[in-house]
């Protein structure tokens, strides 16, 4: 069976779309619906009328699980040790509420 998942985005540009969201949605579908073997996923940007699409197959889901479990392991380690190293992103300057962070452009 084939499943379709769409995440509607209100951002102004699809230029920096995070396809990781599509991967996680596909893994969620595979976990909850054993009869689904293909997921067609999309990020639909409603403001700029752009769409980012990808297709995922159950047969290759183990590769995606390895990727995401590795990322989760890093988060779990940070939580266990209460060490949260700051990382810069495009949101730091205008949107971060952590004023004491070295990457916050408003401090």
Where are these regions (language model features)?
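RecB-family 4Fe-4S metal-dependent nuclease core
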Residues: 1-107
